[in-house]
């Protein structure tokens, strides 16, 4: 893996090519170049948490230290400096010091065996999204996926940092999309510190998968609209019908928590207090009652806010720009500060009667959709990204799943018509069925080496007749997105 090229792809020419002083590769006749931006790098997670790092202003300095750093800031700052005379503690990595946004990144954190995922799971979800990651890095507890922009977004204070606000909304929407099916850390800084690419941690890299900010913006609009957000307010009510938010379990869980600090940052206190205030507002309580209870809550905190900050948060909640606390955001807060094991059932009250299914073994009829789940799981278990299909017989499938013969034939026909699976049947004594899911085929094509891709696609196309299928369409779509010739004036755009 050409790590210097990976680094340069992410940084988008945001740093000088050579060190300003003591360069070992710049020729004598080449001028150092005008000053650009700076990034921060750290040699271990412990150093990163403690703020002990180095300021880097050139690509040469990064390459000199290849594989010695563990973390960095992939988005470029205007300047970087040190907070102490020994030049050990870095200073300057704040949002109002951002120079250019190069990439969005997602942190996939695996805490339990149940949450275990692979890079292939990330790529599979990305296929549904329609935007592929440029880079996937393996970390100690999971993965980080980079979505590098086609051209960087430049940040200006004149626009009141609207580009940062716009990019934050897109970044949050990307995280929430992946968070529906994968263990995503929804609380980490959008443009902060990430894992740095090294020879020992890059799982996937394809520089062709870079998209314009406009494309991300258009997608983000749709995501925001689908959530029911209004453009003027990003927080929307989302309580249980017929139930006051202050009477729901999540409210008491947050109200009686006191330790809102640590690695996640002190911003947790503000977010929690604002959310609790919204719950009081949506439940019909007066602003005076809310203020009194928030003062009581604040006094119990290990690190309380100033009184004027409490009043500001309560008044903001009662400004009528919001109707209630957002259900998704409530879940994020409770998982971050109370317990990561909490589920929706633990947090929200659901009213009404529900008819529960009998166990499948106790039912005479099984829905085709259930057999579909079993078959897709069977295909996934028996194949992998390097051999995305399995060769077997219908008899073996029937015995493995316990599915009737006619049902299997019908299921194969339906799934093939929907292009969810592809198969080829060979008749005769040594015959059988060659079977693959559409996603596993597409994923294997994406991950195969560039020099082998053409012949590999040709072989799969001949085996499974892939011409004029969604696989061919998706590959074209991912590889041939329209390019933008000019830098966007992002600061006049509404990002939804």
UniProtKB/Swiss-Prot annotation:
This protein's record includes keyword Nucleotide-binding: no
Keywords assigned by UniProt, alphabetized: DNA replication, DNA-binding, Plasmid
GO BP terms in the entry: DNA replication
KW Transmembrane (keyword) present: no
Pfam families referenced in this protein's UniProt entry, alphabetically: PriCT_1
Highest taxon above the source species: Bacteria
One example GO MF annotation: DNA binding
DNA-binding region(s), residue ranges: 120-141
Role played: Essential for replication.
Name of the featured protein: Protein RepS
UniProt organism field: Streptococcus pyogenes
Gene: repS
